[in-house]
Every structure is written in C-alpha cells, then in structure tokens.
From Swiss-Prot:
The EC number(s) this enzyme carries: 3.6.4.-
Biased composition (Basic and acidic residues): 458-468
Name recorded for this polypeptide: Transcript termination protein A18
Annotated localization: Virion
UniProt cross-references to SMART domains, sorted A to Z: DEXDc (SM00487)
Motif DESH box positions after renumbering to this chain: 204-207
Cross-referenced SUPFAM superfamilies: P-loop containing nucleoside triphosphate hydrolases
Record-linked Gene3D superfamilies: P-loop containing nucleotide triphosphate hydrolases (3.40.50.300)
Organism listed in the record: Myxoma virus (strain Lausanne) (MYXV)
Residues given in the record as ATP binding sites: L111, S112, C113, G114, F115, G116, K117, T118
Domain Helicase C-terminal: 302-454
Length: 478
C-alpha cells in the first residue's frame, strides 16, 4: 500500500515540480481522488514510486520482499546489443542500491523509439527471476511482447478476452508472465490477485496514461503497488514521475541516415460548399481540438492529389519501398487507400484500420514483404506499431503535439536492413482558411524531427503553380 500521510511543504514542493503549475491530485484517506492544496492537514495516499529517487526524503523505509519466483527451469536471457547491455547494467546497479537503502524498486526506462525497450525489459525480467505482469494500452502491442517473451522461454498467458475470462483461466493454470491490457486493472479482485502472486510489473508506453486522472491504473499503483515496477517510454510524461520517479536514459548512437523531405507546392485557391460550411466552425468552440482543421484538410483535393503523385512516383522508382501513410481521419485514410490501390493493386497496398479485427494479421504479414504501402491513422500507428522494416513515413495530417510527433516518427527510427529513412511533409494547402494553421503545425513537426530526433532537412522541393501561365500554356511550371 502507498504511504498514507500528511504532505509537508518540502514534499508538496517536490511533487509540484512535475506538474508545470497544474493541480496535484491524489487519493485522500477516504480513498477519494481530490486536489491537494499546500499546508493541508488531511492525509493522502502518497505513491511509493515517488520515493524511488534518492532526492526525495523517505517518510518511512520501503522493505521489498519478493517471494513469487518464476517456475520455468530453463529461463533464458535474450541477446542484447551493447547499448542495451549498458542499460541493463545501469538498472541492475540502481535496483541493488534501492534495495539496500530501503527505497522502492521503481524505474522509468526512457529510451528512444527503436531502442529495443521490449527486449531489454524481458532481459530484466529474467534478471529478477520473479513472476511478471506486462501491461499494454491496447491489443496491438501484444504480438511484439509475445515474440520477446518467447525468447526467454518463460511460461506466459496472453489475455485479450477480458479479465473475467483470465480469472477463470488462472483457477487451473499459472504462468510466469501475464500479458494484459490496462483495462483489466479496473477489476479490484484481479488487482489484488496480481499484487499477491506477481512481483514485477512492466507498464509499456507509459506516456499514454495521465496519472493525474482518476483511472484504473492510478488506483492500481496507489492501492496495489507492485514490488518491482518499470515504466517504458520514448516520450515520458513528466507528471507520471510522481508514480515512478527514477529514470534511466541512454542516448542511442544510430547509423541511420534520417532525412526530412519537405514537398512545397503553391496551389490555386480551392473550395467546395462542404469546405465553406466547415470553415464556419474554425474559430468556434467546436474546433477546440482542431477537428474541423483536419476535416477540411481531408477535403483538400489538390493537396491530396499531390501526396498521391509524390508517393506513387517515389514508390515506382524504388526510392521508397516500405511506406506508411498516416492521416488523422478514417475518411482521409480510405481516400488514400483507394487511390493507391488504383495505382498499385492490393498486392502492394494495405489498410491499417483499427476497426477491422484482421488488421493485426495484416501488420504481421508486412514483416515479410519487401515492398508495400500501408495506409493508416495516427491513432492506430502512432504508438507501438512494430514494423521495423519501414523506410518511409508520409505525414498527411497536421494536428499533432510534440509527444505524438516523436512517437509517429519513431515508426521509421528502427534499426533494420534499410539505413535510409525518409519522412515526407506537405506544408501547403489550397484552402486559404487553414493555410496558417497547417504551416504552424508543420513547423512543429520540423522542429521535433530535426532538433530532437536528428533528421536532416533536405532542400524544399515541389511544384509552383502559376495560374496565368497554367492557362496560357496548359502546363505546370516547376
């Protein structure tokens, strides 16, 4: 159980450092999720993970006793690259120190996209030799964990059919590793069971959870805290440090040649009645999350055609071979899918539709293909999509925050036989109402990709459309 105590000024100040002036929410002694104000005389459950960092004074020692040993006799360490071994060495040294100083054995592995967090975590799982729960945000990530866990030769159970089905299964069967989706944690009985019978908890893609919200995961970490806990992420959420406060971050030296290709095109103005109606919502509360910006962008036929022509040309000439085209809306996704199918057929073009239960099988089939165009949404492909062979990313949407951008670009930052990785951006629109918004969001993508992820920006290229010359010569001037 987390520590239930009053929060003095020093600890309150320490916790607020992670919140960027946002309010601090914790469970009070009555187990209600409430805002914590300074100098409060009330008691709150303080997540033990915050004490994993030696900069935070302990309220009381944390004695970690792990009794749930793995049962597989032939547990095997998976092979690691030298940099992954360095992470393991740092983590194990830190964990020994935590054990000896009576601090919780909690650590965030802040490692870049493509580093191999999954295999590194599985190695640590074998190091601890304790039964483990691996928690993922959605079913899409289960396949890559299954493949990594199999390398350890530990017994495992994958739960995709709901927590009630899993609980029935656990009555007659046990396993060293449980792979679950996070919504299982809404079941209190299940939370207590894994707290009692499993010692290690691995939270994949931890940035996808805001632990300042009253969620199933927040409750689990507060009332059923694991004995050993790892958060895995390439883009850590600062507020989550309150639940897992120690971080290991090893910079990856990559041999990848990462280029950012910006395709400029100066269009004639384009509009339709549909666009004009949607444009009326741009400066209203209805566009709070820029949904109408994306809806209008999906209707930008000249820009859409430019994207299709650019990708088709590069694909035909073999300049790109394994391409992912990413949009925000399903309507936009099906538009591009249909266009590319017209050009190349279904032997080369695939749809990453989150609503299609067969999509995971499609993704698995792409691992063996030499050439393909995969069209999907940022929601489906932004986090956890595991196709290491991807060599090109085509970003068709606009509205992405820095975390989403980094996760999306991470799809083409994986080490593979292709060392050349290309990201395509299309910063122009034929629709004047969203011209400045598109430019603003594109600059954000450029900034994250070049300043943070090491992409090299190529000279801007494209076509400049001159209306007068177009009419005179019936041709486009490059």
């Amino acid at each position: 159980m987390s520590v239930c105590s009053e929060i003095d000024y020093a600890l309150y100040t320490e916790l607020k450092k992670f919140l960027n002036s946002q309010p601090l929410f914790l469970f009070n002694a009555d187990k209600n999720f409430v805002e914590v104000v300074p100098s409060s005389s009330f008691k709150f459950y303080i997540p033990i993970g915050v004490f994993s960092n030696s900069d935070v004074a302990l309220i009381r020692p944390v004695h970690t006793t792990c009794t749930n040993h793995i049962e597989s006799a032939d547990a095997t360490f998976p092979n690691l690259y030298p940099l992954q071994k360095r992470v393991v060495a740092e983590v194990t040294t830190s964990m020994r120190q935590k054990l000896s100083t009576h601090r919780p054995m909690y650590m965030t592995l802040h490692l870049s996209c493509g580093f191999g967090k999954t295999i590194t975590a599985c190695y640590l799982m074998v190091v601890h030799r304790r039964k483990t729960v691996i928690c993922v945000p959605n079913k899409m990530l289960i396949h890559q964990w299954k493949a990594a866990v199999e390398l350890t030769k530990l017994s495992y159970i994958i739960s995709t059919d709901g927590v009630s089905v899993l609980l029935k299964q656990l009555r007659t069967k046990t396993a060293d590793v449980l792979i679950i989706v996070s919504r299982h944690l809404s079941n209190d009985y299940f939370c207590k069971k894994i707290h009692d019978e499993y010692d290690t908890f691995i939270l994949d893609e931890s940035h996808m959870y805001n632990l300042m919200n009253n969620s199933a995961l927040t409750k689990f970490l507060t009332f059923y805290p694991p004995r050993i806990c790892y958060f895995l992420t390439a883009t850590p959420r600062l507020a989550n440090r309150i639940y897992c406060n120690d971080v290991v971050n090893v910079l990856k030296v990559s041999t990848l040649m990462k280029r950012l290709k910006i395709v400029e095109y100066f269009f004639e103005p384009y509009s339709t009645e549909c666009i004009r109606q949607m444009a009326k919502h741009l400066n209203t509360e209805n566009n709070k999350y820029h949904i109408y910006t994306e809806k209008i962008l999906a209707e930008d036929l000249p820009r859409n055609n430019l994207i299709v022509d650019t990708v088709s040309r590069e694909f035909k000439h073999g300049l790109v071979e394994r391409v992912i085209v990413v949009v925000k809306l399903r309507k936009h996704m099906t538009f591009f899918y249909d266009k590319f199918v017209e050009e190349f057929g279904t032997d080369y073009v695939y749809l990453g539709d989150a609503k299609n239960k067969d999509t995971s099988a499609v993704v698995k089939s792409l691992l063996q293909k030499k050439k393909f165009i995969f069209v999907s949404t940022s929601h489906y492909s932004g986090t956890g999509l595991d196709i290491p062979s991807l060599d090109s990313l085509v970003i068709c949407c606009a509205v992405l925050n820095s975390m989403q951008i980094e996760q999306l670009l991470g799809r083409v930052c994986r080490e593979s036989e292709s060392v050349k990785k290309t990201v395509f951006l299309f910063p122009n629109t034929s629709i004047r109402e969203i011209k400045h918004s598109l430019g603003f969001f594109t600059e954000r993508i450029v900034s994250v990709s070049t300043d943070k992820l090491g992409f090299q920006q190529e000279g801007k290229e494209g076509t400049k459309e001159e209306p007068a010359l177009t009419k005179a010569f019936s041709s486009q001037i490059r």
